[in-house]
């Protein structure tokens, strides 16, 4: 496994290491043809292609083999942190000798700055930053600027503003053994890079001094570096074990990158401060002309305070709102983002593109609408608008080769792709489930008979309904009929959801009822029947895409079957049925031609990588505290657990704990409990980006 901290030497001799996949198996099924078609398409000049891969066909492995063939730095974007974490682990195992990095929002908790005009209430930005994820973000940008064999797995955070990569690279400090530099001179340079001196709490982004020895903990690294001086010359450098303090290796040279992505050289900071001050005075005059003296005073006081902090420390809270001044951009120009740290020629993989593309498209307008009231009421200068995510057009302009990956590509992907390459035949040779339509009248009685058949074969059943009330009533009915059944609803937290899946797999119950069973973690080999009630009703959960996705839940069992209960066959139903039957024909023909026999996927229950399954979650949703003091202690305990969960990449669990903390703060009127969930109605969920 590659060292996530990366080597320390600035020359990076391993920068020429080629991408090489290490997998326990060779491409199979449709994978060899898909890999060859995609690679040929790019080599022939295609800029955008789509990999249409059915559930369980090994799309991630196919993407990996394509990367190996193209030998290009690669950005992989997922639509939430949890999926990004899963992909990160998969790519790390497939590319053990290359730099596989992880770039998502570093917030455990995030309440965006906002102003609610109706109640004249200003809400300060409130955030809890996860230091480990911050380290991983810096590791990603460092790798992109110092080596070629890089894969970055990211959430939509990849399109949000980041510092100028040229400043980040040019301000980097190269230190070599034998170099003539005084100890105090090195300390001053580290401060310029926004490193903090801390002789007690020695963590990433800090340094400490012990006589003629300086120890620096790089922002991106897992190991601190000891620099020993002999007079005004560096005598020795070593990488240290962070716990024992013992020497891991001697280092001839070290390259320190800034501790903040928004780091700016002193001369440029002075120029930026003057430009900000000029714009502030213009904004004050604007408010005075319109008679809004409160806003005029507010923008002057707030901006002046920020300028004083920037002049003194080179940084201020909310410095991202001044990002346009800290680079060579003009107002309205696209912000610098993670994409600008990539070389000109790189591959972008958009995973689950039918969900990720709409998410990318929606970020810009959502961010702008929240800032309107802040700018209009003097809380921020208009240039705060330039601290924003990319528009979709800007995103498309900054990317080069693009590969959309989905079992159900959307209209955008199909329209933009030069080729839609299908991966229909699975390496396991399983075929898509058989589909039947049953009358909605008497659907529950029919379902009971089908459940009995599955129980007799020690198989499992998923049932999806349209409403919470119907799911509850059906669960109650099945229980009274003696069926071992559980119900998964929108309030089921992360750990409970995974425990439900685990219990279903172990046979603790036979049927799982839910409303939206498209979520990750529900690819269960033991499920041989998916029952879709009220399949002919219009709506998102009964669209062609959703139906195909739901049908795929039965695609990992050789006896897989889907039953649609409906009074009529809608266009969405027919399209989903036609597509599934088309895939079945292709899969069965392949099996007949090659003499292969499909078998149910065998996967030990313990092999399921369930975020949060091994985390102590006692009291997360336990008994309510009796008074404010108990509540405050519980919130403090929960906050520590939230940070631990996020550090372990268990983001859904961290989100559940965050929500419990909000409930306690509101119920007992603790600090931070009076902020609305999202005043502008547009802030992205922390676990999404």
UniProtKB/Swiss-Prot annotation:
The UvrABC repair system catalyzes the recognition and processing of DNA lesions. A damage recognition complex composed of 2 UvrA and 2 UvrB subunits scans DNA for abnormalities. Upon binding of the UvrA(2)B(2) complex to a putative damaged site, the DNA wraps around one UvrB monomer. DNA wrap is dependent on ATP binding by UvrB and probably causes local melting of the DNA helix, facilitating insertion of UvrB beta-hairpin between the DNA strands. Then UvrB probes one DNA strand for the presence of a lesion. Keywords: ATP-binding, Cytoplasm, DNA damage, DNA excision, DNA repair, Excision nuclease, Nucleotide-binding, SOS response. The beta-hairpin motif is involved in DNA binding. Gene3D superfamilies: P-loop containing nucleotide triphosphate hydrolases, UVR domain. Residues 1-26, 668-689 are annotated as: Disordered. GO terms for biological process: nucleotide-excision repair, DNA damage recognition; SOS response. This is UvrABC system protein B. Forms a heterotetramer with UvrA during the search for lesions. Interacts with UvrC in an incision complex. CDD domains: DEXHc_UvrB (cd17916), SF2_C_UvrB (cd18790). Residues 632-667 form the UVR domain. Residues 40-422 form the Helicase ATP-binding domain. ATP binds at residues 53-60. One of its GO terms (molecular function) is ATP binding. It is found in: Cytoplasm. Residues 443-605 form the Helicase C-terminal domain. Belongs to the UvrB family. The keyword ATP-binding applies. GO terms for cellular component: cytoplasm; excinuclease repair complex. The gene is uvrB.
């Amino acid at each position: 496994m590659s060292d996530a901290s990366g080597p320390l030497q600035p020359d990076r001799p391993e920068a020429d290491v080629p991408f090489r996949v290490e997998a326990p198996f060779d491409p199979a099924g449709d994978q060899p043809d898909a890999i060859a078609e995609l690679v040929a398409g790019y080599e022939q000049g295609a800029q955008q292609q789509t990999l249409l891969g059915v559930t369980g066909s090994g799309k991630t492995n196919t993407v990996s083999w394509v990367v190996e063939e193209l030998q290009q730095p690669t950005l992989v974007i997922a639509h939430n942190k949890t999926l990004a974490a899963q992909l990160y682990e998969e790519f790390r195992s497939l590319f053990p000798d290359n730099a596989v990095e992880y770039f998502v929002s570093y917030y455990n908790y995030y309440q965006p700055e906002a102003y609610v005009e109706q109640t004249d209430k200003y809400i300060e930005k409130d955030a809890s930053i996860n230091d480990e994820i911050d380290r991983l973000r810096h590791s990603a940008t460092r790798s992109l600027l110092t080596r070629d064999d890089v894969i970055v797995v990211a959430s939509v955070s990849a399109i949000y503003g980041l510092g100028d990569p040229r400043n980040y690279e040019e301000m980097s400090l190269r230190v070599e053994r034998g170099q003539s530099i005084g100890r105090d001179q090195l300390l001053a340079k580290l401060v310029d890079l926004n490193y903090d001196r801390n002789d007690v709490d020695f963590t990433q982004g800090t340094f400490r001094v012990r006589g003629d020895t300086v120890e620096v903990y790089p922002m991106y690294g897992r190991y601190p570096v000891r620099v020993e001086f002999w007079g005004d010359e560096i005598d020795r450098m070593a990488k240290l074990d962070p716990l024992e303090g013992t020497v891991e290796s001697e280092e001839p040279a070290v390259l320190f990158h800034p501790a903040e992505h928004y780091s700016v050289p002193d001369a440029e900071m002075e120029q930026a401060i003057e430009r900000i001050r000029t714009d502030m005075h213009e904004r004050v005059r604007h408010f005075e002309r319109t008679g809004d003296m409160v806003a005029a005073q507010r923008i002057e006081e707030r901006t002046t305070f920020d300028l004083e902090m920037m002049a003194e420390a080179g940084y201020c809270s909310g410095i991202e709102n001044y990002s346009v001044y800290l680079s060579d951009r003009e107002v309205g120009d696209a912000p610098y983002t993670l994409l600008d740290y990539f070389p000109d020629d790189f591959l972008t993989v958009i995973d689950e593109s039918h969900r990720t593309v709409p998410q990318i498209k929606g970020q810009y307008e959502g961010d702008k609408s929240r800032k309107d009231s802040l700018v209009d009421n003097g809380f921020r200068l208009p240039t705060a608008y330039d601290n924003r995510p990319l528009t979709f057009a800007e995103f498309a302009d900054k990317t080069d080769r693009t590969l959309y990956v989905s079992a159900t590509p959307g209209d955008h992907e199909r329209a933009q792709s030069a080729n839609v390459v299908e991966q229909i035949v699975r390496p396991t040779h399983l075929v898509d489930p058989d589909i039947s339509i049953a009358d909605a009248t008497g659907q529950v009685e029919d379902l009971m008979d089908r459940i009995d058949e599955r129980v007799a074969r020690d198989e499992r059943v998923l049932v999806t309904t349209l409403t919470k009330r119907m799911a509850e009533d059906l669960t109650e009915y099945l229980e009274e009929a003696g069926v071992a059944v559980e119900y998964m609803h929108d309030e089921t937290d992360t750990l409970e959801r995974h425990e439900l899946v685990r219990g279903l797999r172990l046979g603790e119950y036979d049927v799982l009822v839910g409303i939206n069973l498209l979520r990750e973690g529900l690819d269960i080999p033991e499920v041989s029947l998916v029952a879709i009630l009220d399949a002919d009703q219009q709506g998102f959960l009964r669209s062609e895409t959703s139906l195909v996705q739901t049908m795929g839940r039965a695609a990992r069992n050789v006896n897989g079957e889907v039953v649609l209960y409906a009074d009529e066959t809608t266009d969405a139903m027919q399209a989903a049925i036609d597509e599934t039957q088309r895939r079945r024909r292709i899969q069965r023909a392949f099996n007949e031609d090659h003499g292969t026999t499909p078998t149910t996927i065998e996967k030990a229950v313990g092999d399921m990588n369930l975020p949060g399954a091994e985390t102590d979650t006692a009291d997360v949703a336990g008994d309510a505290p009796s008074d404010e003091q108990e509540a405050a202690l519980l919130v403090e305990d929960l906050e520590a657990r939230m940070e631990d969960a996020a550090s372990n990449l268990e983001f859904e669990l961290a989100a559940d704990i965050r929500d419990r903390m909000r409930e306690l703060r509101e119920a007992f009127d603790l600090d931070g409990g009076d902020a609305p969930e999202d005043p502008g109605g547009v802030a992205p969920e922390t676990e999404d980006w």
